């Protein structure tokens, strides 16, 4: 079986919340795709409940695209501690951390239920499992800790 980088990361050494560049891959035509670890909570210490994480996922899908060029996808980790962000091109971890911070700030302070996309049976595969309250509370908690652009030492942006 292929080795997966995420499973070789020593999860006891990282200091969440942070943004980490996992890899940059160059395709046959020269296009670059970047994969980032957006770690919101400390691994093996806490996990965001699925309803809140699901709502954060739906909101980040739009909010990150508003703040960062080339967003392909932002998908939650199964462990519920953060997200993979996949983009075209190269962005510094500082750039991504600022986009994440702005997005979480919007969730915490500005977003209302009417702003959450994909919350009915036609547009979401598990539309009953959402919580804007949880998404807001977790966003506030993450922002209160500061988002680092480095995974192993705190360099809060």
From Swiss-Prot:
Keyword Transcription among UniProt keywords: no
Q: Which UniProt keywords apply?
A: Autoinducer synthesis, Iron, Lyase, Metal-binding, Quorum sensing
Question: Gene3D superfamilies, from UniProt?
Answer: S-ribosylhomocysteinase (LuxS)
Which InterPro entries is this protein grouped with?
LuxS_sf, Metalloenz_LuxS/M16, S-ribosylhomocysteinase
Instruction: Output the GO biological process annotations, alphabetical, semicolon-separated.
Output: quorum sensing
* Residues annotated as binding Fe cation: 54, 58, 124
The answer on whether this UniProt entry bears the keyword Chaperone reads no
The disulfide bridges present are none
Gene Ontology MF terms in the entry: iron ion binding; S-ribosylhomocysteine lyase activity
Enzyme class, spelled out: lyase
Question: Any coiled-coil ranges, and where?
Answer: none
Q: How, per the record, is the cofactor bound?
A: Binds 1 Fe cation per subunit.
Q: Which domain of life is it from?
A: Bacteria
Q: Which cofactor does it need?
A: Fe cation
EC annotation from Swiss-Prot or TrEMBL = 4.4.1.21
Function, as annotated, reads:
Involved in the synthesis of autoinducer 2 (AI-2) which is secreted by bacteria and is used to communicate both the cell density and the metabolic potential of the environment. The regulation of gene expression in response to changes in cell density is called quorum sensing. Catalyzes the transformation of S-ribosylhomocysteine (RHC) to homocysteine (HC) and 4,5-dihydroxy-2,3-pentadione (DPD).
Q: How does it assemble?
A: Homodimer.
Identify the NCBIfam families for this entry.
Answer: PRK02260.2-4, PRK02260.3-1
Q: What is this protein called?
A: S-ribosylhomocysteine lyase 2
What is the gene name? luxS2
């Amino acid at each position: 079986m292929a080795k997966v980088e995420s499973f070789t990361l020593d999860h006891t050494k990282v200091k969440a919340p942070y943004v980490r560049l996992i890899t940059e891959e160059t395709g046959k035509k020269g296009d670059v795709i970047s994969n980032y670890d957006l770690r919101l909570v400390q691994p093996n210490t806490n996990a965001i409940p699925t309803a809140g994480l699901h709502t954060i996922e739906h909101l980040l899908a739009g909010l990150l695209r508003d703040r960062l060029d080339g967003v392909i996808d932002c998908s939650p980790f199964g462990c519920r501690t953060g997200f993979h962000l996949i983009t075209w091109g190269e962005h510094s971890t500082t750039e991504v951390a600022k986009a994440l911070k702005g997005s979480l700030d919007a969730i915490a302070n500005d977003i209302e239920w009417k702003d959450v996309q994909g919350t009915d049976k036609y547009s979401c595969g598990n539309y009953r499992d959402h919580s804007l309250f949880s998404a807001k509370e977790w966003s506030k908690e993450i922002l209160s800790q500061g988002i680092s652009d480095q995974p192993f030492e705190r360099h809060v942006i």
